[in-house]
Amino acid sequence: MPERGRVSVPVGPAGVEAGGGVTAFVVRAVALLCALMTERSSVAELAGILREEVDRYSPGERLPSSRRLVERYRVSPVTVSRALAQLAAEGVVVTRPGAGAYRAEPSGPATPAPGDTSWQEVALSAQTAAGPVPRSVDASGVLVTLAEPPPGVIEFNGGYLHPSLQPERALAAALARAGRRPGAWNRPPTDGLPELRSWFAREIAGPGGEGGPTGADVLITAGGQSALTTALRALAPPGAPVLVESPTYPGMLAVARAAGQRPVPVPVDADGLRPELFAAALRATGARVLVCQPLFQNPTGAVLARERRREVVRIAREAGAFVVEDDFARSLAHEDAGALPPPLAADDPDGVVVHLRSLTKITSPSLRVGALAARGPVLERLRAIHVVDQFFVPRPLQEAALELVGSPAWPRHLRAVAAALRPRRDHLAAELRRQVPALAQAAAPRGGFHLWVRAPEGTDEAALTGAALRAGVAVTPGRPYFCAEPPAVHLRLGFAATAGTAEITEGVRRLRTACAEALPHGAGGGEPVPA
């Protein structure tokens, strides 16, 4: 290896080459620059050679001295010193002042990639019950999002739009126009107003409309929760297993349990429901119903990946099972959501999918108007359950809904909400990273009302949510979102029910105080980070 890094240029008192002038000074500067570039190249080259040679030595064994390396590779001492420093920074060697360089001791065994234990959620819940499944009515998971927080408490647990985001003027105008319609207070058709059924059918079918439901396939319901209750009662008898996403909306679990059904979890990842575990759950339980939220799933915000969409419907069709598609968040897309995938029901000629949606989330908690869409004989069973449960949805509400969605204010409202939710989402995510980095976030969803965060291992969920409420911020515990043992402690943090970004900042500050009290020691949950 030729000698590099040594350049000798005699310099006179004036800083130029002895006996020269400006030309000699330029020559010297160029020579120095070339020397610097050559030196850097030599360091990298020597480090590469030594990196291979060090494997010949045992851990802890001394390498040749710097002098020997200078002689062997014909480089400068500076080059040797820098190459060894680079290898020390990489953990290949250890340098000891005055004693030389040694091969580094091997580090501990690499941490193996975590295994995937998601299948256990299916296995632990798949056993056939020895007797009838007891009916249980537990509304605690639902009441968390419905209860009014105490005065002064910031609402991170809300499931509806803040009043400032609701279309109050448009709703008032729609109600006024609806009240003037002929027969507004007469009894409506039990299936719903034909015009409203047709509007929902067009929304489900999307542009083009081929392959989607028609108005005759739609039933008007008193909101999404009512539609879900009707669907589960119609599709699964008491004692039957019902496949659900894990985690999932507590209100759905409450409906299934109240009907005496047995929820069986199918895990969700970043791309939505996992088809292979869905198929495994069908085989293990004999279930004939899956309830899923393919778009901005509650609580994870996941969107069912394109390649999984057809797979889920195919698996269900081959098993003779129904897919209940809860499309609650289609109107809750954020400004940066891009083009949304169509509903599963938009291309379902075989009637596998029972679709439900609602106007409530995008308007007001009190506009409880939704829809069920299905094809084939199942529609008759849905209709029968629907009539027995509620007769019909009050006509003034249906008329008001028609007036609202048919007004110029409707598309403006959708755009306004999309524009308002994105900065709230981004601000909450940023404040959590800044103030409470111990709460791990997945990728922020581009639709819906909330973030799903994981607390450090060892966190007491009840203690954390209690501490948050004492600090002045209401958060939603994650445990009610699982029908089997949860894999970790989670919180659902909403941003749509807040007044704006300033309130979000204050809410996270209060949550940081709660984390300092309730997170395991050393979790780093309560340390303020400068803005």
Briefly describe each language-model feature range.
Residues 182-319, 331-347, 421, 523, ...:
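Conserved core of the PLP fold type I
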Residues 1-176, 383, 387, 393, ...:
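N-terminal basic, amphipathic alpha-helical segments
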Residues 353-435, 442-443:
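PLP-dependent aminotransferase class I/II
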Residues 373, 452-454, 494-496:
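Short hydrophobic/aromatic beta-strand micro-patches
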Residues 338-360, 380-381, 491:
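Conserved active-site segment immediately N-terminal to the catalytic lysine
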